Amino acid sequence: MLAVSEDGKLVVAGSDSHGTAYGILEISRLLGVSPWEWWADVTPEKKETFRLSGKFRELQSPSVEYRGIFINDEDWGLMPWSNKTYEPSDVKGEIGPRTNERIFELLLRLRANTYWPAMHECTLPFFLTKAIGKQRKSMASLWELPTANQWRAMLPENGKYVEKEHTIT
């Protein structure tokens, strides 16, 4: 919920951490910031002022349960760009933490709640990347997980996708 209170204060509230984040990011949308601002080089138009009417109230809820991004065909696009250009790494097939942070930001801006990470054999599986600890904890607190401390992920194993359980520490 995004509303202007009787005393003129902007109120942002959500039913959970997602809803609150979406409410905060709705302000950026009202200001003209595209969810794709970083990925598509969409520079927001500068505004001198921004006002909401005293009666402004917006209440939104999702129309589908799972909304997210599935990283696919990363072997020719995302992974080499991340690994060689955006955050060079000696770890073969790694999509690094800075790239994942940008993906998570996009997910929030798009009001998503689900992330299906890259899973081709050439890519280091998301949950096996070195610098993922902070992101795991962030995801555990923000993204809906099957249980409080477990995430089921599909990992490439001998050319087949195998469901494995990972404990978030």
Q: What do these predicted regions represent?
A:
Residues 2-168:
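Feature activates predominantly on carbohydrate-active enzymes
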